[in-house]
Amino acid sequence: MLLLRWPTFCCLWVFGLGQLEQTELSVTRATDESAQISCIVSLPYFSNTAIHWYRQKAKKFEYLIYVSTNYNQRPLGGKNKKIEASKDFQTSTSTLKINYLKKEDEATYYCAVCRSGTSWVKIFAKGTKLVVIPP
């Protein structure tokens, strides 16, 4: 759980409070293609909100990447850019892109934000299942 260290240390976990929406229940793509998963964020101050992306395979919940206040994508996976996250400020949407798909990328992917109030709460969307099929 090393990957979950800093994004989750101060947050309670809450799923599906309606402030984040992943409209596709599942996405199917062939091996070696790319998949995009979108997350509509209905929160004030979208431009200042960091969007975090996770995936769950079996019982393993893994932190992947985040995109914050700027337009720049934050790639993961070196020069190959296996995983990228971006924000569209016009539509209040964050998109996760998984490139060079392999069978091991098959999982349920979740977007999340951390919101403050009397305490920090991490809010999750309901998730999108990625299915990877042979070419």
UniProtKB/Swiss-Prot annotation:
Disulfide bonds: none annotated. Gene3D superfamilies: Immunoglobulins. It holds the Pfam family V-set. Residues 115-135 are annotated as: J segment. One of its GO terms (biological process) is adaptive immune response. The keyword Cell membrane does not apply. It comes from the Eukaryota. This is T-cell receptor gamma chain V region 5/10-13. The gene is Tcrg-V1. It comes from Mus musculus (Mouse). Residues 19-114 are annotated as: V segment. The keyword Signal applies. Residues 1-18 form the signal peptide. PANTHER family: NON-FUNCTIONAL T CELL RECEPTOR GAMMA VARIABLE 10-RELATED, T-CELL RECEPTOR GAMMA CHAIN. The lineage of its organism: Eukaryota, Metazoa, Chordata, Craniata, Vertebrata. GO terms for cellular component: T cell receptor complex. InterPro entries: Ig-like_dom, Ig-like_dom_sf, Ig-like_fold, Ig_sub, Ig_V-set, TRG_var/const_region. Keywords: Adaptive immunity, Immunity, Immunoglobulin domain, Receptor, Signal, T cell receptor.
